[in-house]
């Protein structure tokens, strides 16, 4: 008669292979790997776990949302603060972004940096703070003007003083000799607008008083004659302007006085200008045209017309 196996005999009925498989499953479920580690490795792992700390990380520079926002004119938050002359706010922004050159030198749609706008709005103290924070004074706007060009054009002596503060000999020389897209240096602009104090300051700092603008080679002295400004002429002569420097067409400053009302300027320059640079160049001799034919070669009358094989007499 068949009798069921007793509970204690189940393992024997499964066989040795099934028992080994079950044992491996238990090992895989419960073994964390610690038993296979050496004592030294285990101690090192415990030490590293104890040393784990959560440290706050600073957000990367420029990640602040307000730095990325621009108006339709391309103005940043700093541009707007300067335009609206919010000085306290501007100073706080400059303090926060000090050293962030990409933001400080960002140019709007007119290629104006915050430094350009500080000069335009006549805020020399803001301009000074921007320079200390890292603004580049040699960047140009859409007309090729550096901030110093604008200061000279507007006649803001305080801004000129801030922008020409000692920051290295090479830097100062570069900014003084820079020309805008019309070819004018800062000295040219100061001369054109008649700001004598700025002219004197620029020359004392090393500006080339005889620099020629590229359009026709006029120097500041030529410009002073064109503008009929005798006080500027006197100052430029005092600063060492060359009265015998000629334009690309060969005109000296004295020759530009002919036909102009200021006899004072003519007297000032006449005493110093070479004799051959005082008279206007002679015009072409009109009599030379009398000996020339009335017609050019292409306009001479025909004398060899032929019709039907017969020469025509004209």
UniProtKB/Swiss-Prot annotation:
There is a cross-link at residue 21 (Glycyl lysine isopeptide (Lys-Gly) (interchain with G-Cter in SUMO)). SUPFAM superfamilies: Ankyrin repeat. The keyword Acetylation does not apply. ANK repeats lie at residues 110-139, 143-172, 182-211, 216-245. GO terms for biological process: B cell receptor signaling pathway; canonical NF-kappaB signal transduction; interleukin-1-mediated signaling pathway; lipopolysaccharide-mediated signaling pathway; negative regulation of canonical NF-kappaB signal transduction; negative regulation of cholesterol transport; negative regulation of cytokine production involved in inflammatory response; negative regulation of lipid storage. A motif (Destruction motif) lies at residues 30-36. Residues 1-41 are annotated as: Disordered. Interacts with RELA; the interaction requires the nuclear import signal. Part of a 70-90 kDa complex at least consisting of CHUK, IKBKB, NFKBIA, RELA, ELP1 and MAP3K14. Interacts with NKIRAS1 and NKIRAS2. Interacts with RWDD3; the interaction enhances sumoylation. Interacts with PRMT2. Interacts with PRKACA in platelets; this interaction is disrupted by thrombin and collagen. Interacts with MEFV. Interacts with DDRGK1; positively regulates NFKBIA phosphorylation and degradation. This is NF-kappa-B inhibitor alpha. It comes from Sus scrofa. The gene is NFKBIA.
